[in-house]
Structures are given as structure tokens and as C-alpha cells.
Amino acid sequence: MACVSYPYEAPVSQTLFERAAAVTPGGVNSPVRAFRAVGGTPRFMVSGNGPYLTDADGRTYVDLVCSWGPMILGHSHPEVIAAVQEAVARGTSFGTPGEGEVALAEEIVARVEPVEQVRLVSSGTEATMSAIRLARGFTRRAKVIKFAGCYHGHVDSLLAAAGSGLATFALPDTPGVTGAQAGDTIVLPYNDLDAVREAFRAHPGEIACVITEASPGNMGVVPPAPGFNQGLKDACAENGALYISDEVMTGFRTSKAGWYGVDGVRPDLMTFGKVMGGGFPAAAFGGRRDVMAHLAPAGPVYQAGTLSGNPVATAAGLAQLRLLDDAAYAKVDAVSAEIRTLVTDALTKEGVAHRLQNASNMFSVFFTDRPVNNYEDAKGQESFRFTAFFHSLLAQGVYLPPSSFESWFVSTAHDEQAVQRIADALPAAARAAAEATA
């Protein structure tokens, strides 16, 4: 790891981290939050307002994580908060159907044309796990194609060569996943259609589905090559498999219809999360009516959840989606473009080799002079420069994802003042990256 000095301490966060470590493995409830990839003390946040987070030590940061994507309207949006307060006042969970879940499902179906029916769940992991089970039940096949660097939640069969936290910690897979569980997963290089076609030739009549992030953000942002997603769809159609587009990250962030609204490739099944929950645990999977008809109680493929369609989560999600009109997306896209230009200009001025890649308003920086088209390319970056860059920005009150393998996110709340604060911090951060050593 790079030799990095931390310009200030975070004593309250450090105390909380030590308390957490005594009762929680690694002191966190999701590994990348632990700052292991960058070093230092994880910041324990106590509040968020608009584009800002405030930590337990009283320091305020411009937030470029946005809770890993969901907070596209910024923190504590008054209309979302009001919807949540009204829902909580009526009760927090009923264990029955409710109008809120119907309204949220209707909103998703109205926005995303390939989704004819949708099932609500509580996490992106549940959504992808359930979509895979449904694809297997529908096709009566077992094997699944996924791509190295694409992360689809912590599902046993999908953790092979996954991105996100596994990439952050340089883990090829994880203990606890048996050979039998992983044996039906075929892992291929991302953006390689020839490898996909060869896999179908090698396993005729065995592959249930191909699952891919619609535009990956869990190995850093690595967009699909032109024609790649359509090629996946075509290969699936030719071989009787289902094409599953994982839009947990891109869904309702990259456009009103997610990445489908960008590339127009029609999946058989799709998964959603993050933005659709408005900051609450909510996710969904949906797609073709004839496929969804195989789900219980309509069909034989079982899936269930005590808190699926939770009334508070659906109220938050519905409020957020209804606020995401064309003007909101134009705002997020414009802010993202402005920040991307600032980052590139600062790094270029200091002579730092880098590739800034984006998928709509999602983006990340790779510290390399080579194109990044797949997971192997992403792993070739000089991560020690990111560490120095990260800590310089953190010290100046700009909060990035604590990993070079994660997307950055912005919101409609990132105003001129927030952007200026980022602009003011970037020159020193770029110098820190330039001067960093492995």
C-alpha cells in the first residue's frame, strides 16, 4: 500500500470503529466500508442533508458515494422524508399485501417497457438470486454464465470472480461456497462475445441464462462495448437461454428506464434495487409475463420474503421515483459531466496517467494509461495512486468510495457550492496522486 499520511484523525469514528469491531466482524456490516483498501479510520456518519454527509466527529463532506447509488435526490429530500413519515405513522409492517407495493410495481412497469410483471424483494442480492432460480425453473437447465468483475450480490453461485468488495479485497472467490454450488457457474471475460458463443457451443442445452450488469460499476465503471449486450441477447435467444440484465445499480439512475433506456436491448428478466428504494431496503426482479408466471403462487418456482413490499420502503421508493422526471436526470447528468471534467483536468495538469470512464452519470477513475474494458484491465491500475487521491480529498471534505473498484455517484442536490468545494480540493489531490509511490 502507498505510504500515506492522514492529515487529521477522526477520534469519535475511531472509538466507534473499535466498539463495532468487538461485536461485528471487521467492525462493519459490509466489507468495503472498512477502508481496508485505502487504510485509515472509516468515517461513521450521523446525518446527511442534500449533497453533504456529517460524521461523528462533526466534519461535513461533499458526498460522492450517495449510499452506493440510491440517494439520487440527495440526502433527506423533504418529499421522500414526508412520505416515509406518513407511512410510518400508519404502521411499519403488516405481512399482508398493501396498496403501496402495487403502486410501486405499477411505476416500475410503466417506466421499463420489457418488465411486464415484477416481484418486490428486500435486497439486490435477493433479486438476482431469485431471477437465477426463476431462469433455471423456466428453462429446466442448471448452468449460468456470468462475467468476471460483475457483482450480483453475495449469492453463492455468483461470487466467482465477482467485483465490488471481492475486487476491493483481491479475493478470487470466497470460502463457504462449495464446488457444487459454483460448479454450474461459467465465468467469462467481460466484453468478450466470442467467449460467450464458445460457452454455448461447449454446453449445448445446459445453460439456463446469461446474467450481466447492464453497464458494470462494480469493477469501476466499465461500459459494455458497442453491440455487446445485444450480442448477449441474441446468443441467448439462439440457444434457448434467458438474458438477465442486472440493473440494481443502473436502474432508474442512468435514465428513467435505467440502462434499458440507454441501449434499448430488451432483456428477458431484469433486476433492480438501490434507487427504487429511496434509501430503504427494497429491490425487485421482473420481465416477461410468461416467465414471471412460473413464480409461486402462480407457478412452481418458490420465492418469498417476510418484508417484501414493506410499506415504509415502498412509500420511500415511490416518492423518489415520482420525483425523477426528465429535468431531474438532466440535472444529475450535467453535474456528473462537470465533475468529470474537473477531475480529468486536475489529473492531466499533474501528468497523472488515468482513464475516467462513465456510464451516463455514473463514473470512476482508473489510474492507468491503458483502456479498461474488463476486470483484468481494471486490476492493472495503480491503486496506490487512488489511495493518495482518496485521502487527500477526504481530508478536504470530499467523500469518495473507499475503493478504486467502485463507481462514484452524484445527485440532483449537488449544487454549485458543492461542485466548487470539489473543484477546490482536486489540485492537491491530483498532486498527491502524482507523488504517490507503491
From Swiss-Prot:
Q: In which pathway does it act?
A: Porphyrin-containing compound metabolism; protoporphyrin-IX biosynthesis; 5-aminolevulinate from L-glutamyl-tRNA(Glu): step 2/2
Compartments, record wording: Cytoplasm
Instruction: Indicate whether Isomerase appears among the record's keywords.
Output: yes
State the CDD domains in the record. Answer: OAT_like
- Which GO BP terms apply? protoporphyrinogen IX biosynthetic process
Q: Which reaction does it catalyse?
A: (S)-4-amino-5-oxopentanoate = 5-aminolevulinate
Q: What is one term from the GO cellular component aspect held by the record?
A: cytoplasm
Please list the residues that carry the modification N6-(pyridoxal phosphate)lysine: 274
Cofactors required: pyridoxal 5'-phosphate
Main localization category: cytoplasm
Answer whether the UniProt record assigns the keyword Cytoplasm to this protein: yes
Entry superkingdom: Bacteria
Q: Which InterPro entries match?
A: 4pyrrol_synth_GluAld_NH2Trfase, Aminotrans_3, Aminotrans_3_PPA_site, PyrdxlP-dep_Trfase, PyrdxlP-dep_Trfase_major, PyrdxlP-dep_Trfase_small
Q: Which family does it belong to?
A: Belongs to the class-III pyridoxal-phosphate-dependent aminotransferase family. HemL subfamily.
Q: How does it assemble?
A: Homodimer.
| Protein name from the UniProt record | Glutamate-1-semialdehyde 2,1-aminomutase
Name the species this protein comes from. Answer: Streptomyces avermitilis (strain ATCC 31267 / DSM 46492 / JCM 5070 / NBRC 14893 / NCIMB 12804 / NRRL 8165 / MA-4680)
What's the name of its gene? Answer: hemL
